[in-house]
């Protein structure tokens, strides 16, 4: 929609392939005609979904009775509004209040862990908690059946499974909250003695971050940013292991100066929001080391190889 040049997404997806990005998608530019009428230049890509050839995590099994009507429940911590900085842009957080809301029990495990709100598909059932996740960091989280908001206001929705159970949402939310607690710690360790890198594959997230920096993509960790997780569970349904993987790269419409929104503007007005994770990541030497190694290695090679590719593709776009 914002890709006025017609090359933004092509360049980003191709570079992501070049640097060995996690779950990098196939992409093919096409001229689209519908009933003989030219409709413009489109990119045909893989869909972001759980599959061995897409995002390779285990698909969950459900025992939901056929024909059960869909419904959503939203759970919100008491005094929800007081948890946010008064100078922050809260319009997206306020969306959590819309819809069916349940006053959480005092012993709700997710809220006790620091999660501020979450939603789940009430009709779904599992005999036993199982399966992996494709999560999207996105301020448009309320479009999905399952989502949660972390202690620092990061909004995360479930892309797969599309309709998660309460147990699935709680398990994933608690695990991500443990990661965030470690990320915000000066030492990088949370109260459980686990380092943030125990939860996060640093290299994979460094790839999506550096790609966003290079292309001027200001939606990083704000919208359309994917994380996937292949977890291990204990007998109580808690996630005990597995690393959040950055990727696949997606939605680079607003890159290469396609918009005048800048990181500095976003950060100054959204201090507790999604992009607050960026400043915390950059405080940790292992993340900046990963960026430097990538910048001087695989990324430098990708930039060099892309020069001819983009020029050639640009000529093709001009011809279209």
Locate the predicted segments by residue.
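Alpha-helical scaffold elements adjacent to nucleotide-binding pockets in ATP/GTP-utilizing enzyme cores
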Residues: 11-12, 44-48, 290
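TRNA-binding/sensing appendages of the translation machinery
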Residues: 4-16
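Active-site catalytic microenvironments for nucleophilic, acid-base chemistry
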Residues: 15-19, 229
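Solvent-exposed loop/turn segments at secondary-structure junctions
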Residues: 2-5, 37-39, 47-51, 140-142, ...
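Short, acidic/polar N-cap/turn motifs at the starts of alpha helices
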Residues: 27-29
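Internal "kinase-insert"/substrate-recognition segments embedded within catalytic cores
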Residues: 1, 18-25, 37-210, 314
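Middle-to-C-terminal accessory/interaction subdomains
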Residues: 158-222, 228-320
């Amino acid at each position: 929609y914002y890709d006025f040049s017609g090359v933004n997404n092509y360049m980003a997806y191709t570079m992501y392939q070049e640097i060995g990005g996690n779950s990098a998608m196939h992409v093919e530019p096409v001229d689209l005609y519908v009933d003989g009428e030219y409709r413009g230049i489109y990119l045909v890509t893989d869909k972001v979904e759980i599959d061995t050839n897409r995002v390779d995590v285990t698909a969950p099994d459900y025992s939901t009775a056929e024909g059960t009507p869909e419904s959503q429940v939203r759970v919100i911590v008491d005094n929800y509004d007081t948890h946010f900085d008064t100078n922050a842009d809260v319009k997206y957080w306020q969306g959590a209040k819309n819809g069916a809301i349940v006053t959480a029990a005092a012993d709700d495990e997710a809220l006790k862990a620091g999660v501020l709100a979450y939603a789940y598909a009430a009709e779904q059932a599992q005999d036993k908690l199982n399966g992996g996740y494709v999560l999207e960091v996105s301020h448009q989280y309320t479009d999905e059946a399952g989502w949660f908001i972390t202690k620092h206001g990061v909004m995360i929705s479930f892309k797969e499974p599309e309709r998660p159970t309460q147990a699935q949402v709680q398990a994933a939310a608690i695990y991500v909250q443990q990661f965030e607690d470690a990320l915000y710690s000066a030492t990088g360790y949370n109260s459980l003695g686990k380092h943030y890198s125990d939860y996060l594959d640093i290299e994979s997230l460094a790839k999506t971050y550096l790609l966003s920096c290079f292309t001027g993509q200001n939606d990083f960790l704000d919208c359309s940013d994917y994380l996937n997780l292949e977890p291990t569970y204990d007998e109580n349904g808690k996630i005990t292991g597995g690393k959040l993987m950055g990727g696949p790269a997606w939605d680079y419409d607003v890159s290469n100066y396609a918009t005048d929104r800048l990181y500095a503007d976003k950060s100054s007005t959204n201090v507790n929001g999604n992009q607050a994770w960026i400043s915390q990541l950059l405080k940790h030497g292992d993340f900046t080391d990963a960026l430097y190694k990538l910048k001087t290695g695989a990324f430098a090679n990708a930039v060099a190889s892309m020069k001819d590719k983009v020029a050639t593709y640009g000529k093709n776009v001009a011809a279209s």
